[in-house]
Amino acid sequence: MAFYSTAKKIVRVLLWPFYKVETEYRAELPQEQGYIMASNHVSDMDPVMLGLAFHKPLNFMAKEELFRIPVFNSIIRALGAFPVARGKGDQAAIDHAVGIVKNGGVLGIFPEGTRFKDGKLHRLKSGAVVIAAKTGADVLPTCIRYEKRR
């Protein structure tokens, strides 16, 4: 994950003038075992910002359409993202996610299935619960909010 940690340092420097990344933990995060980080999804920047906020690398389940963009495909794969065919019960994506969590990794997932900019919580998809049931892993509910640096 050398690419991940290098990219994280570069992105932190580039975004620092514009965004203030703060984290608040209500519980101790698991250090050894894998877990599922389930967050709301309000912006294209969410995976980047969450990656900056967490100490362990996040492996995001991302819509398959993103992997059709040639250069972007290579970058997000190198950062640990993997494709999911939304709305199709993508068993290969579920199996991949289960493997990440069982091997001590952190799965990043947006249970609403897409971005919503209205600030409301929308109907959740079942993926996070299915993966938690298959792995016995904890699900860390996460909320992301954006405020510009003043």
Where are these regions (language model features)?
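Short gly/ser/thr-rich secondary-structure transition/capping motifs
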Residues: W16-E24, R145-R149
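Short secondary-structure boundary segments
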Residues: H41, E64, G113, T142-E147
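Residue-level detector of anion-binding/catalytic polar loops
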Residues: N59, F82, V106, D138, ...
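Catalytic core of membrane glycerolipid acyltransferases/transacylases, capturing the structured
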Residues: F3-A7, W16-P17, L29-K88, H96
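Catalytic-site beta-strand/loop segments enriched in glycine and acidic/polar residues
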Residues: I100-A128, T135
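A cross-family acyltransferase "interaction/gating" segment
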Residues: L29, K120-R150
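Alpha-helix C-terminal capping segments
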Residues: L52-A53, N103, A133-D138
